[in-house]
């Protein structure tokens, strides 16, 4: 976690300042869950993008299911450019499977075989030409999985909230935000189909 309040307490990205604590955490997780079942998600560093690379000899002592690396520092939070060269150095140094996390959009060539889908990918879906079909299918799947309109609407509203920088969705967002049923949502979406 890159948030200052968390890292000041020595948690999340604050573990970059406490490598012995990080190592105890890895040991406990791997011991408790068994080899290859515990995962670590981290940043490239707290302030610099070479800090994780310096910790790789310690991290490599533990058989992780996956090492997920957000290719920014904690200090950057979610702004600035991801450092793909630093990510590649960490991936090359790792004895565990590595998953990329950071800026990545639909259609981009992934910087690693494994990619954690995050906000930037989800945002890019809203601009796709086939978004109406995808969203309709997602509503259907959510209705089959969840019980009632309220949780389905919550899921859809969260998804659509990521798309409000796109003109169509910015225009629809006030209507989507206040709709109370799945059928009402479907009506809003149908009325705006074809990029209207």
Model-derived regions: residue spans:
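Active-site beta-loop-alpha junctions enriched in small/polar residues
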Residues: 1-2, 41-47, 72-74, 101-107, ...
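Short connector loops/turns at beta-strand edges and beta->alpha or beta->beta junctions
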Residues: 1-4, 67
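Glycine-rich tight-turn/loop motif centered on a GG-T
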Residues: 3-22, 75-84
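Short glycine/serine/threonine-biased micro-segments
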Residues: 10-12, 43, 100-101, 116
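Active-site mouth loops of central-metabolism enzymes
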Residues: 14-16, 39-52
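Alpha/beta catalytic cores of nucleotide-metabolism and tRNA/nucleoside-modifying enzymes
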Residues: 20, 24-33, 37, 52-66, ...
């Amino acid at each position: 976690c890159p948030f200052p309040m968390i890292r000041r307490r020595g948690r999340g990205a604050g573990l970059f300042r406490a490598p012995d604590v990080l190592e105890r955490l890895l040991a406990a997780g791997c011991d408790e869950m068994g080899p290859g079942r515990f995962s670590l998600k981290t940043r490239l560093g707290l302030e610099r993008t070479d800090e994780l690379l310096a910790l790789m000899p310690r991290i490599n002592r533990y058989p992780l299911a996956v090492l997920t690396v957000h290719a920014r520092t904690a200090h950057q939070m979610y702004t600035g450019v991801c450092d793909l060269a630093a990510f590649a150095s960490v991936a090359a140094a790792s004895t565990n499977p590595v998953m990329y996390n950071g800026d990545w959009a639909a259609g981009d060539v992934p910087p690693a075989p494994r990619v954690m889908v995050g906000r930037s990918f989800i945002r890019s879906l809203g601009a796709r030409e086939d978004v109406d079909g995808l969203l309709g299918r997602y509503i259907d799947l959510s209705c089959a999985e969840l019980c009632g309109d309220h949780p389905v609407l919550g899921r859809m509203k969260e998804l659509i909230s990521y798309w409000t920088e796109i003109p169509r969705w910015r225009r629809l967002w006030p209507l989507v935000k206040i709709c109370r049923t799945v059928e009402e949502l479907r009506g809003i979406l149908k009325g705006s189909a074809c990029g209207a």
